[in-house]
Amino acid sequence: GQGERQSATASGQPAGKVMGASGAPGGVQLIRLPNLGASDDTRADENNDSPRGKLLLDGSNVSRAVQDVRRSLGTDLTDRWELDDDANRGRFLLRPYKPMYISFMDWTTSLNGTPGTPNPLNTTDAGNASLANQGRRAETTFQISFKSKVAENLFGDNGDLWVGYTQRSMWQIYTQQLSRPFRETNYEPEVMAVFRTNYRLGGWHGRLASVSLNHHSNGRSLPLSRSWNRIIFQAGLERERWTLLLRPWWRIPENAKDDDNPDISNFYGRGEAVAIYRHGGHEWALTVRHSLRLNPSRGSVGLEHAFPISSYLKAHINLFHGYGASLIDYNHRQTRIGIGVSLTQWL
């Protein structure tokens, strides 16, 4: 079969197509909802023209209803990554990627006053302390993140090519005596090949698999330069209101002399898992990174909560503990708490 991207109703209409309802009141329309993750029994019902999957709705609410039902079926990944025809919006348009937020107050238990690495060229000390992280433990942090699809159906009716960009900045806005500098900014462009999947694993539905080439750097000169390149593999699974992203990666080796941070994998990690739960307009996201080594065992844990405060804006609270809050702090352990607003979330 052609998979979910090619799903259609038994009547020959594309999934989700709006059809007129004979005898229905003015403005009321009959729609058939997308056949997502349906069992064989469900498909049989549809072929027998069962009312399952049909709703009578006011025309102005059709789009919202389709979106709500898709989410209740566990299709957030399908919508965010445009994995079927109903979700497909075409190429060369900006789409949300990772959360976009601003934490007006982001407080840390410990500033990294003399950041360093095993490479002596990338280490600060008393002799160049003016180059080190300075300022207050409270700052403003914001992140922008977007992606765009540049090619579709690389392998038959599956496989899309995306480009993405994420930028996270830490702004010492409360440090007036230092002219409110940006303490750290991390840049993360990447190219991603994303494939639709359809399998079951312990009650979870595997929706996507991807592989990406990722560059991550802070754009600074020695001794504060930090950077690395990775190949990131990703599996995306869903279960009702839950979404799980499993993201192991492999660091592309560098020449030892030019390596800004040769031990970054032992602190920042060799992979991460992101568990997302959505309900009633709220979204909780738990991110766990780990070095995948037992001695020593290092990594981080982060928790985000976003909830509505207006029609288009959500409050955003985030907690972080461990290593890698930023690249300059990849080997500095700290606890952070941030409070602000978000425009987009993981899903």
Locations of the language-model features?
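Outer-membrane beta-barrel initiation region
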Residues: 5-178, 185-189
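Outer-membrane beta-barrel "beta-signal"
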Residues: 317, 333-347
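Residue-level signature of outer-membrane beta-barrel architecture
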Residues: 148-150, 193-197, 215, 237-239, ...
